[in-house]
A protein has these predicted regions:
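A short hydrophobic/small-residue beta-strand
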Residues: 165-167, 341, 431
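Long amphipathic alpha-helix in the N-terminal Rossmann-like dinucleotide-binding domain
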Residues: 44, 66-77, 91-116
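Rossmann-like NAD(P) dinucleotide-binding subdomain of oxidoreductase/dehydrogenase enzymes
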Residues: 118-259, 391
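ALDH superfamily catalytic-core signature
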Residues: 225-371, 434, 481-482
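Conserved C-terminal structural/oligomerization subdomain of aldehyde/semialdehyde dehydrogenase
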Residues: 24-30, 215, 250, 304, ...
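Short, well-ordered beta-strand elements within core beta-sheets of diverse protein domains
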Residues: 27-34, 49-55, 141, 249-252, ...
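Hydrophobic face of amphipathic alpha-helices that form TPR/SEL1-like repeat modules
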Residues: 1-24
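N-terminal alpha-helical segment of soluble enzymes
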Residues: 22-87, 287
Length: 486
C-alpha cells in the first residue's frame, strides 16, 4: 500500500482507494486516502519542525538538498518506471528528461538558498535601509498528475532550501513517485517534519490543506477553476498559481519552417499533449499555410502511439477514462464546429498490443481551418489535439494570439528581429519563446497571466512565494526627530 509520509515515517489511513495503470486498465495497488485528520497531523509536524529548520545554516540546508538530488539521480530508472506506470507518459521522456530534471531541481536550489541576498538603501549619511529574505513557515505544495515528480520537486526544492517546511499533496491519480520522494527525503537526512507527503483526493485532503490556518503559503499547479476556488476560500496567504493554458504558436512566412515544424509538433504532442505549456493553437501566415499544414499533418500521422514502457513510443495513454472522454469529447466538438480533421480523430490507434486493449489511447489529432472563436480553440483540452489557424499579417497574429482567457506560454517564429520584439512585448503571456520550443532554464520566471495564474517561480523568483521580505531601517543617530510635548 502507498501511505503518507508524516513526521518522517509512513502513516496509514482508514480509507483507501485503488490506483490504476492508464495504459492497461489494471490495478497497481491501494493508496491511503487522507483527509482532515491526516492533514492536521502533517501540518502540525511541519509547524513544529519549522523553527529549527529555518534556523539551520543555509550551507547545511544546501548540503541536504544536494544529497536528496543525488539519491534521485541514483534512482532514475526506478522512478521513471513508476512515473510511466502511474501516468502513461512514455518511458523515454520520464527516464531521459523528467526524472533527471527533478534531481537537478535540488542541485539548483541548493545553490540559490546560499544567495538570499537583500538590498541596501542609504539615505545620505542619515539612514540605512536594508532588506532580509526570511522563510514563510508551513507551505502547502499541490502538485498535478501530468508531470507529478518533476513538478513536486520544482516546488519542494526552493520551499525547503529557503528554510520553510512543507506538506506536499499529490494528485490521487499519480501517487507513486511522491511516496518515493518521502522515502528518499528521509534517507537523505532531511529532519522529520520538514517534508510531509499527503495522499488523497482534492476535495478532502487538498481542501483541508489549503484552508488550514497554519499554512502560510500555497504553491498550486492545476486547473484554472480549482485555482480560483482555492484563492476564494483559503484566506489571506501567499499564493503561486500556475493554472491552465491555450498557448499560441505564431509562424510567419519568413520563419525557418523546418525548425518551426519540428518545434510545433514537439510542443503539442510531447507529454501526451497533457502539458500546460502545450502549443495547442498554431497560427500560420496565409502564404505558407497550405504547405505547413500538409507537412504537419503528415508528420503527426507518423508519430508512434503505444505502450508507454516501450522506448520507441512517442505518445502514450491518457491518465484516466474520464480524461480520455473529455479529450475525445473535444474532438467531437471540433467535428461539429466544422473544423477540418487532417489526422487522428476518434478511432483508436492501430496495432496496439493485446495488453493495451483497455488503455486510454488517442491518436495525435490535427484540426485545420479552425476559427479562433471555436470551442476547440478557446478551451483547454489538455491532450494530443491541435488547432491550425491561418492569419494575414502581424497585427492579426497578435490579435488572435491574445484572444483567449489564458496567458501562460507563447511561441514566435520569424527571422525579423524587430517583429519578434514587438510581438514579445505585445503578447499577453508570462513566457515568450522566440524561434524555440519550450526550453526551460531554472533561473527564468515561470508563470502566467490572465486565467493562467498569478505569481512566478524559478530561481530567485521563487522568493515571491517561499520567502518574506523584511525591511530594516537604521538611523545613524543624527537625523531629525520632531520634539512633541516639549
Amino acid at each position: 500500500m502507498i501511505k503518507h509520509w508524516i513526521n518522517g515515517r509512513e502513516v496509514e489511513s482508514k480509507d483507501v482507494f485503488v490506483n490504476y495503470n492508464p495504459a492497461t486498465g489494471e490495478a497497481i495497488g491501494e493508496v491511503a486516502s487522507g483527509g482532515a485528520e491526516e492533514v492536521e497531523q502533517a501540518v502540525a509536524a511541519a509547524k513544529e519542525a519549522f523553527p529549527k529548520w529555518a534556523g539551520t545554516p543555509a550551507k547545511e540546508r544546501a548540503r541536504l538538498m544536494r544529497k536528496l538530488g543525488e539519491l534521485i539521480e541514483q534512482n532514475v530508472p526506478h522512478l521513471a518506471e513508476l512515473e510511466t506506470l502511474d501516468t502513461g507518459l512514455p518511458i523515454h521522456q520520464t527516464k531521459n528528461v523528467l526524472i533527471p530534471r527533478a534531481s537537478h531541481n535540488f542541485d539548483f536550489f541548493a545553490e540559490v538558498c546560499t544567495r538570499m541576498d537583500g538590498h541596501s538603501y542609504p539615505v545620505d549619511d542619515q539612514m540605512l535601509n536594508y532588506t532580509l529574505y526570511q522563510p514563510v513557515g508551513v507551505c502547502a505544495l499541490v502538485s498535478p498528475w501530468n508531470v507529478p515528480f518533476m513538478t513536486a520537486t520544482w516546488k519542494t526544492a526552493p520551499c525547503l532550501a529557503l528554510g520553510n517546511t512543507a506538506v506536499l499533496k499529490m494528485s490521487e491519480l499519480s501517487p507513486l513517485t511522491a511516496n518515493e520522494l518521502g522515502r528518499l527525503a528521509v534517507e537523505a537526512g532531511i529532519p522529520k517534519g520538514v517534508l510531509n507527503v499527503i495522499q488523497g483526493y482534492g476535495a478532502t485532503a487538498g481542501d483541508a490543506l489549503v484552508r488550514h490556518p497554519d499554512v502560510r503559503a500555497i504553491s498550486f499547479t492545476g486547473g484554472t477553476a480549482t485555482g480560483k476556488k482555492i484563492m476564494q476560500t483559503a484566506g489571506l496567504k501567499k499564493y503561486s498559481m500556475e493554472l491552465g493554458g491555450k498557448s499560441p504558436v505564431l509562424i510567419f512566412e519568413d520563419a525557418d519552417l523546418e525548425r518551426a515544424l519540428d518545434a510545433a509538433l514537439f510542443t503539442i504532442f510531447s507529454l501526451n499533449g497533457e502539458r500546460c505549456t502545450a502549443g495547442s493553437r498554431i497560427f500560420i501566415q496565409e502564404s505558407v499555410y497550405p504547405q505547413f499544414v500538409a507537412e504537419f499533418a503528415a508528420r503527426a500521422k507518423r508519430l508512434i502511439v503505444g505502450d508507454p514502457q516501450d522506448p520507441k513510443t512517442q505518445v502514450g495513454s491518457m491518465i484516466t477514462q474520464a480524461h480520455y472522454d473529455k479529450v475525445t469529447g473535444y474532438i467531437k466538438i471540433g467535428l461539429e464546429e466544422g473544423a477540418t480533421l487532417l489526422a487522428g480523430g476518434l478511432e483508436r490507434p492501430a496495432n496496439l498490443a493485446a495488453h493495451l486493449s483497455k488503455g486510454q489511447f488517442i491518436q495525435p489529432t490535427v484540426f485545420a481551418d479552425v476559427n479562433n472563436s471555436m470551442r476547440i480553440a478557446q478551451e483547454e483540452i489538455f491532450g494530443p489535439v491541435v488547432c491550425l489557424i491561418p492569419f494575414k499579417d502581424e497585427a492579426e497574429a497578435l490579435q488572435l494570439a491574445n484572444d483567449t482567457e489564458y496567458g501562460l506560454a507563447s511561441y514566435i517564429w520569424t527571422q525579423d528581429i524587430g517583429k519578434a520584439h514587438r510581438l514579445a512585448y505585445g503578447i499577453e503571456a508570462g513566457m515568450v519563446f522566440i524561434n524555440s520550443q519550450n526550453v526551460r532554464d531554472l533561473r527564468q520566471p515561470f508563470g502566467g497571466v490572465k486565467g493562467s495564474g498569478t505569481g512566478r517561480e524559478g530561481g530567485q523568483y521563487s522568493f515571491e512565494v517561499f520567502a518574506e521580505i523584511k525591511n530594516v531601517c537604521i538611523s545613524m543617530g543624527s537625523h531629525h526627530i520632531p520634539r512633541w510635548g516639549v
